[in-house]
């Protein structure tokens, strides 16, 4: 099937992108790695020995950055519906986080909860702005739901947020559960994109779905 002119234009722009070229040279799977590296440099959110859940992790750019920072004394779980190649010192789980079996697998890998949950999830774009924005906010809310399930008191949540309808409501929800929200726009984010990265710090809520002793609880 022949590519459309718009897809050809996107591919040309993509491969000319300096962060894409740098990722290829330095062995990262995605230009998104540099977004997390910049946030880490500014905020020092990932530390040795932490327990981290990377939601929507494929192809693994953020997982690659986080694994050596956490080290072998910590735990890093990367989950995505899409297949993902292994990353050293990380547990990769392939499946939908709405699936009970996948939730159980995450629980087994992180039995004591998570110190940090991070998500670089974005929807497959339809080209219809209102639809795409709603889907993007849904994914950010999914990451917040994961925080309610597994984040320990004092933990942090890092999410991608596309500014637009629903973003302010999401901000209010985060403020109910966290003491502070830091907003970042990394250099690797394309200037025309409305994406921001929100780092919510010092979780004040209670993880509702964590199975500390093998028994189930419900919302």
UniProtKB/Swiss-Prot annotation:
<feature type="active site" description="Proton acceptor">
    <location>
        <position position="160"/>
    </location>
</feature>
<keyword id="KW-0963">Cytoplasm</keyword>
<feature type="binding site">
    <location>
        <position position="96"/>
    </location>
    <ligand>
        <name>S-adenosyl-L-methionine</name>
    </ligand>
</feature>
<comment type="similarity">
    <text>Belongs to the class I-like SAM-binding methyltransferase superfamily. RNA methyltransferase RlmE family.</text>
</comment>
<keyword id="KW-0698">rRNA processing</keyword>
<feature type="binding site">
    <location>
        <position position="80"/>
    </location>
    <ligand>
        <name>S-adenosyl-L-methionine</name>
    </ligand>
</feature>
<dbReference type="Pfam" id="PF01728">
    <property type="entry name" value="FtsJ"/>
</dbReference>
<feature type="binding site">
    <location>
        <position position="120"/>
    </location>
    <ligand>
        <name>S-adenosyl-L-methionine</name>
    </ligand>
</feature>
<dbReference type="GO" id="GO:0005737">
    <property type="term" value="C:cytoplasm"/>
</dbReference>
<protein>
    <recommendedName>
        <fullName>Ribosomal RNA large subunit methyltransferase E</fullName>
        <ecNumber>2.1.1.166</ecNumber>
    </recommendedName>
</protein>
<feature type="binding site">
    <location>
        <position position="62"/>
    </location>
    <ligand>
        <name>S-adenosyl-L-methionine</name>
    </ligand>
</feature>
<dbReference type="InterPro" id="IPR029063">
    <property type="entry name" value="SAM-dependent_MTases_sf"/>
</dbReference>
<dbReference type="InterPro" id="IPR050082">
    <property type="entry name" value="RNA_methyltr_RlmE"/>
</dbReference>
<feature type="binding site">
    <location>
        <position position="60"/>
    </location>
    <ligand>
        <name>S-adenosyl-L-methionine</name>
    </ligand>
</feature>
<keyword id="KW-0949">S-adenosyl-L-methionine</keyword>
<dbReference type="GO" id="GO:0008650">
    <property type="term" value="F:rRNA (uridine-2'-O-)-methyltransferase activity"/>
</dbReference>
<dbReference type="InterPro" id="IPR002877">
    <property type="entry name" value="RNA_MeTrfase_FtsJ_dom"/>
</dbReference>
<keyword id="KW-0808">Transferase</keyword>
<dbReference type="InterPro" id="IPR015507">
    <property type="entry name" value="rRNA-MeTfrase_E"/>
</dbReference>
<comment type="function">
    <text>Specifically methylates the uridine in position 2552 of 23S rRNA at the 2'-O position of the ribose in the fully assembled 50S ribosomal subunit.</text>
</comment>
<keyword id="KW-0489">Methyltransferase</keyword>
């Amino acid at each position: 099937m022949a590519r459309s002119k718009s897809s050809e234009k996107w591919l040309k722009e993509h491969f000319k992108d300096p962060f894409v070229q740098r990722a290829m040279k330095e062995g990262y799977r995605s230009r998104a790695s540099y977004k997390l590296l910049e946030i880490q440099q500014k905020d020092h959110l990932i530390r040795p020995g932490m327990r981290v859940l990377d939601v929507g992790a494929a192809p693994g750019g953020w997982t690659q950055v986080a694994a050596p920072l956490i080290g072998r004394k910590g735990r890093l779980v990367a989950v995505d519906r899409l297949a993902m190649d292994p990353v050293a010192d990380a547990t990769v789980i392939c499946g939908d986080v709405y699936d009970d079996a996948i939730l159980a697998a995450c629980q087994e890998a992180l039995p004591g909860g998570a110190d940090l949950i991070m998500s670089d999830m974005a929807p497959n774009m339809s080209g219809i702005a209102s639809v795409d924005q709603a889907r993007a906010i849904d994914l950010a809310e999914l990451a917040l739901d994961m925080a309610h399930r597994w984040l320990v008191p004092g933990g942090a949540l890092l999410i991608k947020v596309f500014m637009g309808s629903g973003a302010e409501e999401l901000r209010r929800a985060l403020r109910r559960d966290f003491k502070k929200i830091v907003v970042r726009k990394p250099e690797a984010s394309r200037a025309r994109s409305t994406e921001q990265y929100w780092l919510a710090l010092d979780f004040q809520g209670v993880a509702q779905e964590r199975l500390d002793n093998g028994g189930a609880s419900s919302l």
